[in-house]
Amino acid sequence: MDTSKTPPATATPPVEDERVWKAGRLAPMPIRKLPDAPPSVHILGPTVFLVALGVGMGESYMWPRLVLLFGPEIRWLFLIGVTLQAFVMLEMARYAMATGESIFSGAARVFKPLMWFFFIVAIAVYIWPGHLSAGAAAFEEITGIPWTVTAVVGLILVGVVFSLAKVIYNVLENVLSLLIGTLVLGTAVVAAMVGSWGDVASTLSGMFSFGYFPSQAMSAAWFPVIVGACAFAGPSGMQQMWYTLHLRDSGAGMGAHIPQIRGLRHAGQEEEMPARGFMFDTEDPAEMAKWKGWRRWVTFDALLLFWGVTMLVTISFTVIAQSAVRLNPGVREVIQGDDREVALTAMANAVSHAGSSVLGSVFLGFIALIGLNATLGLFDSFSRGQADMTYHFVPGAKKLGMSRLYGVFLWGVILFGILILLFGPADGPSGILDTLAFLSTFAMGAYCVTLLLVNNRMLPKPIRPKWWTNVIIGFGAVFYLGMLFYSLFAFGVVVG
């Protein structure tokens, strides 16, 4: 898929009395030409970042665990969660492709403190290297190398690769596409080898058991776990918001007018970043035809590449979990416990008995791969988001340039992560874990509200969302915030 930067950011010089689109409290957006859309059907694209962030412990552990606890009928909640995420993705893309701005800038146009809320939440939630633990622990099971060594080396390697890359987006898109392709095909093959058609049928049919909710799920022990699993059906926390930055760097829509972020080694070659985004002429039929082409392109991204891949990986892991319990009934009790690493190792052992020890190692390799995907995606996305907000809204930050700010945040979170891995709890201080979990889930409801405000107030009427789209995004806000606060007030627990 080629979404090259055409025209470049410097190709359209300002003219006197140029037309602009006034949106909110920031500088107006000059009118520019919308690039032609690429073919709708494609393989690679910015969605690989969302898949890398979204296909994690929710898909490989949390949902298989709930299926074993409450039966496959509980998966209707997963279907709602991941489908809702696909609609959120399309609405994030609406603003990013129409303006070349991130959703953070859109939030600032509505109410600048709203943007700073997301800035603070990102630091509070995503500086902890806990997402590395499962992958590194799985790698230790395979190789015997201590997981802390693997995690520290992995962090340094990520920093070096991103720093040396000429254009970070291009390198990361290719690497993540390869890793995710391996994960999708590999888990499907293992599931086919150890599972049965009965496992597949029950997993699929359970997604349509709408309304099923066993009484034992309405307890302080399990309702927060279900809330957490719904929040982690696909990308969680602020990961959808970061997707707008990857869209921009891919050159999607008006992002073609915005320079790409470069590695530190090539930061001096960076073009000047404009202080605001751009808008196309929504009264021009030719421009609107191109806009519809871009919407078809991103819809393919959302439905097939995001929704389809996330669903396939979750089905594969659920089939593996069901077959593991059938092969070794003792695995059920282990998976029902709270120790994620022990549960995954038990599943690997059961898979080994089904074929050979190689299969068990392959399964653990997939868990390690998930950890690597999450590390690459999270560190890049966090650094992009913080650099974007700092560059545009912190006085004096423009002197450093976007690429250098990206490098500062990247190496800052890497060094902090190394210190925590060596001297502290990888998931963060236990006393604030509930607060972090609350903020992560709360951010998802908050960005649904933000989307409604930004897309319905900051965009021209011809490209604003339809009423039914607003209803779905509004339902998302109620879905996330409603479950979160019900869990908090009914059971005194945030999420599990």
Question: Can you describe what each PLM-predicted range is?
Answer:
Residues M1-Y61, A256-H257, G263-G277, K290-T299:
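Membrane-interface "cap" regions at the ends of multi-pass membrane proteins
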Residues G181-A221, I226, A233-T244, Y447-P460, ...:
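Hydrophobic alpha-helical segments and their helix-loop junctions in multi-pass secondary transporters
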Residues L50, L77-G106, W116-P129, G377:
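Juxtamembrane transmembrane-helix boundary signature
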Residues T148-V153, D338-L344, V358, T390-G424:
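Loop-to-transmembrane helix boundary motifs in multi-pass membrane proteins
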Residues A98, P113-G144, A151-L155, G371-Y391, ...:
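Hydrophobic transmembrane alpha-helices that form the core helical bundles
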Residues P38, R65-L90, F104-M115, V149-T150, ...:
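Extracellular loop-to-transmembrane helix junctions
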Residues F87-Y95, E271-A289, T310-L344:
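Extracellular/periplasmic helix-exit of transmembrane alpha-helices
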Residues G24-P28, W63-V67, M89-L114, A137-F139, ...:
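Flexible loop linkers connecting adjacent transmembrane helices
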